[in-house]
């Protein structure tokens, strides 16, 4: 049983490392081709990456804009809540002053 499990493990490792090595070789070849292309045509071939960068920057600025808008709405909501509380407190103060005036009138006469 041990020779079969060793063979299975060896086969499994071999099969998993070959695609990884192929990916590394493929990436290296692609980088070399890009470097050669850039050396002969320095202004060509980067438009795709530039547009990708612009899209990323637009996406980041859109996210920042949404965050800003959300925070702004939170501040406005909080300000509205504080204004409502202040209005209630002002109303209660007027009621208290009215009651105090009535009491003074009642006991002062």
From Swiss-Prot:
Point to the regions of Basic and acidic residues compositional bias. 41-109
Note down the stretches annotated as region Disordered.
Answer: 39-109
Specify whether Signal is a keyword of the entry: yes
Q: Which InterPro entries match?
A: YjdP-like (IPR048164)
Which UniProt keyword terms apply here?
A: Signal
Q: Which residues form the signal peptide?
A: 1-22
Record's NCBIfam families?
Answer: DDRRRQL_YjdP
User: What name appears for this protein in its UniProt entry?
Assistant: Uncharacterized protein YjdP
> Source species, please?
Shigella dysenteriae serotype 1 (strain Sd197)
């Amino acid at each position: 049983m041990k020779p079969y499990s060793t063979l299975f493990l060896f086969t499994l490792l071999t099969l998993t490392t070959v695609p990884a090595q192929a990916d590394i070789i493929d990436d290296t070849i692609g980088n070399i081709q890009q470097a050669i292309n850039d050396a002969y045509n320095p202004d060509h071939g980067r438009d795709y990456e530039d547009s990708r960068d612009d899209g990323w920057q637009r996406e980041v600025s859109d996210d920042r804009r949404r965050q800003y808008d959300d925070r702004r709405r939170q501040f406005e909501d909080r300000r509205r809540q504080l204004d409502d509380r202040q209005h209630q407190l002002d109303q209660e103060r007027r009621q208290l002053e009215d009651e105090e005036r009535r009491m003074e009138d009642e006991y002062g006469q």
